[in-house]
Amino acid sequence: MQLKYMKTLLTPQDGAAKVTCMAWAPNNAKFAVCTIDRVVILYDEQGEKRDRFTTKPADPKYGKKTYVVKSMAFSPDSTKIAVAQTDNIIFVYKIGEEWGDKKVICNKFIQTSAVTSLVWPSEHAIIFGLAEGKVRQANTKTSKSSTIYGTDSYVVSLTSNVSGKGILSGHADGTVVRYFIDDEGSGESQGKLLTHACPPYALAWGTNSIIVAGCDKKIVAYGKEGNVIQTFDYSRDRAEKEFTVAASSPSGQSIVVGSFDRLRVFNWSPRKGTWDESSPKEIPNLYTITALSWKKDGSRLSVGTLCGGVEMFDCCLRRSIYKNKFEMTYVGLSQVIVRNLSTGTRVVLKSQYGYEIDEVKVMGKDQYLVAHTSDTLLLGDLVSNKLSEVAWQGSGGNEKFFFENETVCMIFNAGELALVEYGSNDILGSVRTEFMNPHLISVRLNERRQRGVEDNKKLAYLIDIKTIAIVDLVGGYNLGTISHDSKIDWLELNETGRKLLFRDKKLRLHLYDIESSVKSTMLSFCPYVQWVPGSDVVVAQNRGNLCVWYTIDSPERVTMFPLKGDIVDLERSNGKTEVIVNEGVNSISYTLDEGLIEFGTAIDDGDYYRATAFLETLEMSAETEAMWKTLSKLSLEAQQLHIAERCFAALGDVSKARFLNETNKIADAVAKEYDGDGTDHYQVKARLAMLDKNFKLAEMYYMEQNAVDEVMEMYQELHMWDECIAVAEGKGHPELDNLRRSYYSYLMETNQNEKAAEVKENEGDFTGAVNLYLKAGLPAKAAWLAMSKDELLSSQDIVSRITAALIKGEFYERAGDLFERTRNNQRALECYRKGNAFKKAVDLARVAFPAEVVKLEEVWGDYLVQQKQMDAAINHYIEAGRSIKAIEAAIAARQWKKALHILELQEDRTAAKYYLKIAQYYASVQEFEVAERLFVKGDHIKDAIDMYTQAGRWEQAHKLAVKCMTQEDVSVLYVSRAQELEKEGKYKEAERLFTTVDEPDLAITMYKKNKMYDDMIRLVAVHHKDLLQETHIHLAKELEAESRFQEAEYHYLEGQDWKAAVNMYRVNDMWEEAYRIAKTHGGANAHKQVAYLWAKSLGGEAAVKLLNKFGLLETAIDFAADNYTFDFAFELARLSMKQKIPDIHLKNAMFLEDQGKFNEAEIEFIKAGKPKEAVLMHVHNKDWSNAQRVAEAHDPESVADILVSQAKFCFDQKEFQKAEAFLLRAQRPELAIKYYKDAGMWTDAMRICKDYLPSKLSVLQKEYESEGNWGVEGMIEQAQEWEQTGEYSRAVDCYLKVKDSSNLDLLLKCWMKAAELAIKFLSHDKAVDVSQIVGPRLIQLRKYNEAAELYLNLDLIKNAIDAFIEGEEWNKAKRVAKELDPRLEEYVDKRYKEHLKNQGKVDSLVGVDVVAALDMYAERGQWEKCIDTASKQNFKVLHKYIALYATHLIKEGEVEKVLSLYIQHGVPAYSQNFNIYKRMFQELVNLRDRDCAEAFRMWSDLRDVLLLLCENLTKSSEANSPAHEEFEQMLLVAHYYATRSAAKGIDQLSSVAAKLSISLLRHTELIPADKAFYEAGLAAKAVGWENMAFIFLNRFLDLADGIDEGTLDALDHTDFQDTDIPFEVPVPSRLHVTVEKREEIREWVLTVSMDQRVEQVLPKDERGTYEASLVAASTGIRSLPCVITGYPVLRNKIEFKRPGMAANKDDWNKFLMATKTTHSPECQDVLKFITQWCGGLPSAGYSFH
């Protein structure tokens, strides 16, 4: 967050005139400032002063200067301002929405003390604080106020959280209290939150924490529950003053704190979870800041000062311009203001959850906002200002957004479509789809309201390219799935989401009704389709027609207009709908019938009167008729019967219109009598049910009212006599018989004999029924009735009449049934045969005429064949034994398997003829093996071979042929057949035959002869692979000879000889083809070579054009030159690239040089502008004269180089004089010197140098000296010479250069001589430099004394001391330091200590540095030496190392050694040792198997150490501290353990030992609980206290289970209620008892609980309390514990000198007696300890009082 000064709103005054308060309006349009003179000034958004008003006192009589305005706030709607005043009142002023509106006081709230602060978080609730400490709420609706909470401390500040649902109040005593109007599910606490170190005048509530500051110059950040997160301390900064005010940004992620001349800015870092301080805004002469107010969009901060100034600052993290259209101002991590630069409109985009906004984009024709945070996605509509924030997990920014729909944003990501409705913070719905085209998705959200539908949100999309799914987004369920047979390319729901239009790739248009799930095709060809906005009318184009469906419920009703062009658009505005058609250049509009569209809309809106009125204006047409039908249906459903009557009248449905007219009369009469519309009357409801043909429902309505006659009348009118009679029967109607008679008469009158017969049958008149059935021409029914009634069968007359009628009517089967029932089997069989009822005939024959069965089966088979039921006939022929017929039937029925099965069962050869037919079938279905078998069986082997041949299965044919023919015959047959096929042009078949008889060469020859080279090559590849390439080349050459170049090319390439193909085309001047092949198949440069040859063949301009076309001109020139075709290269260069000519000359010159044509080469070099190359050529050939000539003529600069080259040559030839002359001519004396030096001719070099370069003589001399390989003697001689001539510096250098490792004495002598000369004759600095060289060399040779002496001669004291130290001459080093530079004594000592440490001479180190020595002992683990040495030092040093040793021992698990260490050396009351003492105690009480007499010494030592510690603590500053009390408790526990060990050794004290174990249970906060209960249980069990043993051991088992689980939360404390045994104890890290012992205890506890002999209750004493509890359950009085048993001391007590120490007389006497009788040293030790601890024993002896 950066604060940037914008402008001064109110100029500061010279003196104090503070701005008391300020407030920004929630709508960001107004800013209010209250000055010291109690005037409220109003500014606009830009900071321009627009209005002002004066505040009023609570009582006018007190005047205007009797109060101060402390705080003010705008109402949430920005039309009111609440003003808090110190004269105990709050005024609410209505300021209006416009500037200059009259200011009116609309509320006032009088209080009992001054109002100090105020906020207005919600519509009618103002929260304010009072000087008396109360925080109250004022309701502007009721003008009443009430107290929310009260404190006793002045309210200094009040603030709300970001949402305004939570309030913080700061009080003068430092208290900060929190109150929630609504905690928004956070679960945070209310009430006192924290206490700050000073009054929290600066109080701000950020998103994640609370910032508090005040006069102590500290800014503290507190967490959500008042814990300190961070502290910013400026108390040491003298420039800082007290903090007076704080303000949080609207997002809560930045907080500004004001002080003197300074604003401190803090920004919340979500990643770190802390506040980061930005660089403070320092403004000299601003003085103390008294008020801060942040604009609600976060973009401005206003600052009020002590001198009455108001400054405005711009607040932003960053600002950017997007697409030069929008300004993005990031006012916080989670808030961005987006401003349209052209219109000035603004939208505040904010993350409601406080997430950091990454980047904001404006998309969808600059109308929609999209932004990401880490966990959410922000969307917004800039036009409607609807914003959304939905949960969105990071997808790497790969989403695609579609904004085609104005109400919903479609987001496509990784195959999933999500829909977000603008203004909603939830994802509307998401579905899986791969098709993210707006034309393949349709969303409709409440676009047209329907009757009775609140929320209508539908989605249609593609599941796959042929399947549409329709989803209800409100309920989240599938409304339907449409599977289509073709790909779908467009779909759209209507505005109500009830109909779906879709079009497929074949341009067929379909309509799907979602409610009925009916799909109908509307057009077979449709390039354009669209719903008319605001209606259910569809407009589409079908080739040359404009199609309009005004009533979509009747898709067949379509209005068509011819048109010439294509529909391009549909426009609906100003009550007019036009279809725009593009007819070539012109656009023509076709106006739709708005009235028809109006009808559809009226229907959808449920306004049927409006629809009727509209239809009455239209003439009757197909469309109008469809609309009347729709209206009639809907009005009936809505029970608007008058409209329905009008509709049926219009449709000409007179009967329905009359029926409805009568119904309406009934309804009107009812309505007149009873009010309402009369449609609920039973007659109306019944008539409507009749109209709907639901007669049962109508009957129900009548019967509910017991209107039986009306039901009967209804059924009679409808001639539904059966139903009428049923009603009469059900109700026992008196007219029932008459009704039946009337019904029969009616039937007879209307000649309904069948129905009359049924009535007779129902009445039991079967003879009459039979007569009537016969009369009605229904003999079959008469027969059924006769067969069901035996009395009719007994009448011969009736049976003969019925059978005669049946035979006459050709109902033979029924006649047969009747004859069979009357035992007339012969007639029955005849009838069955006549009626073709063969099954019944056969069944009857099996019983009555067995001989006829076989005949009947054959006849049955013949009948079935006649009926073409061949399949059914087969079995009957088999039954009749007619196999041939059966085979023929099976073949006719194409039951080939059955036919084959029957055939194979035949032994007779007459059936063999059928093999061929069946075999031919199997051959036709390509079941060749079966067919072959049948052909062979039927002696048709030739047919089998032909079958295989035709099927191309030559191998099988061959195999078959071989079986019945010789190999030669087969081959002759196959070859001759193949040749025939060849003649017929069936080459493939011929090939198959050739290859079958192993004659592939014949096939190859055949293909070659017929020039079928592909097939020829294929066979060669299979049968002669080694000849394949050769064949390709051979064919290619043949084809080339025939000028079939393309085919030849193919074979050359297949033969891997692309060069031959290129050459073929080149020879035939087909350069394009040659170039193509070279480029495709040649290497990287092949095509370039072909292009080059092509160009060369063309020559001149044509060549240049060609090469330019391929971009190879320069390459070609280079290639020509490189291949020595210089004429062509020059030709190309001259025509197109003159700049290349010199290069070609140069290459030509090089070529000529290589050819030895030097003169021609020289000319070419000069033409190339490279005379130097010509010179170098002559120089290379040692042709110095020509070189000189060319150089002088063309390159004078090279003359000198020639002379140098000539000189070099002469030097090599040892002609030194010539060489020198040449070099001096070339003016290169330095080269002469170099060559002489290289030749070792130093004299000549010196001479030349002296004559021509005297300035370099000295350097040469030095070089000569350094380079001269003189040897050691030569060096020394030279040095002595320098010395004699007084050149001491050179002499020194010479001596120092001497390096002869074989003669160390000589070396030493030389170096010492150098040092001596330096000291004597050279300057001090030079001498020091020499000593710095010689000294280290001497030290290296271990000549420490000589080195030190050298340093001392030059007063280099420290170097001398270092030399002595290097040689471990410590005494000399100390002496030098002491005598020459006492400051270095400490340095020597330090080095000496380091030396001792490094050498490990600790014993020597003790004398020098004890602490260092002790540390070293400790490091090495030499603890005995360490402690022994430390004991000779002071007490503190000793205990420091004892503490270190103790810590080491505890880590190693040797805690008993720690105890003996403190026994030996005492326990000082050092607080830093407390943890060691506690750890020692814990480790000792955790030890296993210490519940015995043998452990007495350990426990007594622990007890004595703790006693000594407590005594030392009493004398120290830690007396009576919590630590002291804790050690007293440990002492008591250790005493109990020691006493218990003593008692364990004596049988008569077993009860004392048990009591001590039980008393230790109250100390389970210090000792392991499981161990304590285990030991107490065993002790109680040992002395027979089974109740206690059971309870304690049971508790032990519960604890053990808890330790295994890691928690003791599940423990039941019932047994220990009203005892002093603690419930809350630490969970031991491990079990202190072995698994075996634990299982033993578990078995004992189970046994006891099963026996039920022990009551699970702890024993109680006279107090009614558990006997070992110190605290009485009823009174809460705490008794003293007995020093012997730990049990409470009640009546018989012995008191000791030390207060609070007592014993039970009985226990004391018992212990004393046992001690005396046994002389136990342990018991005596206990008594001695009690004397020491409790201040003396009472007089010895028994007490019997």
Swiss-Prot record:
Protein transport is among the record's keywords: no
Disulfide bonds, paired cysteine numbers: none
Origin: domain of life: Eukaryota
Keyword Repeat attributed: yes
Keyword annotations of the record: Cell projection, Cilium, Developmental protein, Repeat, TPR repeat, WD repeat
GO biological process: cilium assembly; intraciliary transport; photoreceptor cell maintenance; pronephros development; regulation of TOR signaling; retina development in camera-type eye
Subcellular location: Cell projection, Cilium
Coiled-coil zones: none
Annotated GO CC locations: axoneme; ciliary basal body; cilium; intraciliary transport particle B
TPR repeat residue numbers: 691-725, 750-784, 809-842, 854-887, 912-945, 947-971, 972-1004, 1042-1075, 1272-1305, 1328-1361, 1407-1441
Disruption phenotype annotation: Fishes display cysts in the glomerular-tubular region of the kidney similar to cystic kidney disease. Knockdown of the gene with 2 morpholino oligonucleotides leads to ventral body-axis curvature, formation of kidney cysts, otolith defects, and hydrocephalus, as well as cartilage defects of the craniofacial skeleton. Knockdown of the gene in a rhodopsin-GFP transgenic line demonstrates that the level of rhodopsin-GFP is lower in ift172 morphants than controls, suggesting retinal degeneration.
One protein family per Pfam: TPR_IF140-IFT172
Chief localisation class: other
WD repeat start-end pairs: 14-53, 64-103, 110-148, 150-190, 195-233, 238-278, 284-323, 483-521, 522-559, 680-725
Family: Belongs to the IFT172 family.
Function: Required for the maintenance and formation of cilia.
Protein name: Intraflagellar transport protein 172 homolog
